[in-house]
Each structure stands twice: as structure tokens, then as C-alpha cells.
Design a protein with these regions (language model features):
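Conserved catalytic cysteine-centered active-site region
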Residues: 14-22
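Active-site capping/gating segments
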Residues: 6
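Non-catalytic peripheral regions of patatin-like phospholipases
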Residues: 1-3, 22-27, 31-200
Length: 200
């Protein structure tokens, strides 16, 4: 069961916040290894088409920094946003490999496809039948952002960010409209704030 220790651990972003001992282990913020776990949504078993909306609170592209605090903000943004884009790149590569396996399977006689040595590998190709649409929004900052904003939970800051997020989401949804991936496709629509963003 989840208790207050688990909540504390979820905020244990070292070195800013300490780890929390749980069951004999020191536990830290899961975002340190996977801040935006896309695999949990996109790799889940199933054959139905899927629309995934991912919100990345950190941006790859940001303003110039002039102070130590701004430099630390930028460092944190780069560390965490890079995780998201590496995960996205890996998912795209995996989808392409599966697509190629499916094409390969079509060229192999049915009797050979039943060979256990081939069957498990070729089965991976069946995971590309569904259509996958990913809408990925990165937070672009707000005018009143403070230094070390990742740790600013004041009411004015949160209100400003929530409103910016609401407007950015509305703009992104209006931009893609009814666009969806076709069967077998993995399509990504990226936005940095409210603006379309080039993706890896």
C-alpha cells in the first residue's frame, strides 16, 4: 500500500531533496531515471488504436541564461528533457524494426514461419498492426518564471503555469484536429509551448 513515505520518495530529487528509506532501500524520485515514461502507455499490450497525450514539464530549447540560478535551471531541463527524447527515439526505432519484421514475415513461406526459431522473432512484427498517435507537449516557460522554477510551488507560479498549459493544450488539439495515424503507423505531433516542434 502507498503511504506518506512513498509520497516523500516521489519528491526525493537528490541532491535537492533527500532519499526516503522504504523496506531497507533508499528510494528517490522516479523522474531521475524516467521522467516521462512513454513506454508504459505505448508498449502496453493490445490491438486497439491508441492516442497518447504526453506532457513534458521540461524543454530541450530554452532561453539564454545569465545567472548561476538560471544555469542550474537549464541543466535540470536538459537532463530531464533528454530522457524524454531518448525514450521517443527508442520507441520510433522499435516500431520501425517491428514494421520491417512484418514485411520480412510476408516474404517467408508459411511452413518456415512456424519454425520456433523464427516464430518468436516474427511475432514481434504483429505489434505494428494498430495505429499509434502521440501528441507530445513540452512546457515552454511563462513570463514570470523564477530561478529554480522546478521547486517553486507558490500559488501565483502554479496558477500562471496551469493557465499557460491549458492554452497550449487547446492550441495543440486544434492544430492536429482529427489527424490520426493510419493502421500500422506511429505518428508524433510535437509542440513546444503552443508552437509546433521538430521531433527526433
Amino acid at each position: 500500500s502507498i503511504n506518506v513515505d512513498h509520497l516523500l520518495a516521489s519528491c526525493g530529487f537528490i541532491p535537492f531533496f533527500p532519499p526516503t528509506p522504504i523496506d531497507g532501500q533508499l528510494v528517490v524520485d522516479g523522474g531521475m531515471t524516467s521522467n516521462l515514461p512513454l513506454e508504459a502507455a505505448l508498449e502496453e499490450a493490445g490491438t486497439e488504436d491508441r492516442l497518447c497525450i504526453a506532457l513534458d514539464l521540461f524543454r530541450r530549447s530554452g532561453p539564454d541564461f545569465k545567472t548561476v540560478g538560471q544555469a542550474m535551471d537549464r541543466q535540470l531541463e536538459l537532463l530531464l528533457s533528454s530522457q524524454s527524447w531518448r525514450a521517443l527515439r527508442a520507441l520510433r526505432q522499435r516500431h520501425e524494426l517491428r514494421r520491417q519484421l512484418r514485411l520480412l514475415a510476408e516474404q517467408i513461406p508459411e511452413q518456415q514461419r512456424k519454425d520456433p526459431a523464427l516464430a518468436s522473432a516474427l511475432a514481434e512484427g504483429t505489434h505494428t498492426d494498430r495505429a499509434t498517435t502521440l501528441l507530445m507537449l513540452s512546457h515552454a516557460g511563462v513570463p514570470q518564471d523564477t530561478e529554480m522554477r522546478a521547486f517553486d510551488f507558490s500559488r501565483p507560479s502554479l496558477t500562471e503555469r496551469w493557465e499557460a498549459g491549458r492554452l497550449n493544450m487547446r492550441h495543440a488539439l486544434e492544430s492536429i484536429g482529427a489527424q490520426r495515424a493510419a493502421p500500422g503507423e506511429f505518428v508524433v505531433h510535437g509542440f513546444n509551448g503552443g508552437e509546433p516542434s521538430a521531433l527526433v
